[in-house]
Regions:
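A domain-level signal for the structural core that forms small-molecule/cofactor-binding pockets
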Residues: 1-264
Length: 264
């Protein structure tokens, strides 16, 4: 049983905006400290950023990111605040886990891979908001701006049960980290995957567990406390390097947000 959404789903638009802002932070510092929350919809985009004092994240640059990804010009309500001094001090000497967390990485299943590829193929054709479900042999396709030809292509699927719909951020609001099931499948996390730098265990340990689970072909469980320098027998500094390379290969944090860890 698996649900997948495409990059134009409102929640993924929020994730992508948050990811793009993190990408911007990484152009300014090698190891920035940043956390981004995005709520977008109905002509407004609300963003709260907690970050290093020396990051220069100006409103013009962020508005450009919002406009590009949302393909609109929503009113931007932006609040940028410095990272808490105690959290910042945690990273003074060496890179350590920036928060507490529980994690379980899981191998990608055939069902998840199949549905993700179906979602990608449909998205390539329609390039608009879509959500898809695969349960055993039952396929449900909710694809905005799609005509009857989609029914003809997927004759055994349940396609758009309510008929034609437009979708997008003028129909539904989007928020960061609200589609973790789509991003991570059977994996378990105590926190969100998007809008955070690599000092945040919710990003780094989640992705490391995912990489390891798919390499070993079995579940990988981990937990950490804020300030831990080692998880699963691996130094956090080394773990960050591994995950940074993984994200670099994908194309950055914005690209990670498009499809999550289960990718076409």
């Amino acid at each position: 049983m698996f649900e997948k959404v495409n990059p134009k789903h409102p929640d993924k638009i929020a994730d992508r905006i948050a990811g793009a802002i993190v990408d911007l932070a990484y152009t300014q510092k090698e190891d920035p400290k940043i956390a981004v929350e995005v709520l977008i919809g109905h002509g407004e985009c609300n963003i709260i950023i907690e970050c290093d004092n020396d990051l220069t994240l100006n409103k013009v640059a962020i508005q450009q990111i919002v406009n590009r990804i949302s393909e609109s010009e929503p009113k931007l309500n932006l609040k940028i605040v410095p990272q808490d001094v105690h959290l910042a001090a945690n990273q003074n000497d060496v890179l350590k886990c920036g928060d507490n967390g529980i994690f379980k990485g899981m191998p990608i299943t055939d069902e998840q891979e199949t549905l993700t590829n179906i979602a990608y193929d449909i998205y390539e054709k329609y390039n608009s908001d879509g959500k898809y479900i695969f349960v055993a042999d039952k396929l449900i396709i909710c694809q905005s701006k799609a005509g009857k030809e989609l029914n003809e292509e997927y004759v055994d699927a349940k396609v758009n049960p309510l008929g034609y719909w437009t979708g997008g951020i003028d129909v539904d609001s989007g928020a960061t980290n609200r589609k973790l099931g789509s991003d991570m499948g059977d994996a378990v996390t105590g926190g969100g995957l998007h809008g955070k730098d690599l000092s945040k265990a919710d990003v780094t340990v989640n992705i490391y567990c995912h990489i390891l689970a798919n390499k070993l072909g079995k579940e990988v469980k981990a937990c950490c406390a804020i300030g831990d320098e080692e998880v699963l027998g691996c130094s956090y500094e080394k773990m960050i390097k591994i995950v940074k390379e993984y994200i670099k290969d994908i194309g950055g944090f914005e690209k990670l947000a498009e499809w999550g860890l289960i990718r076409p």
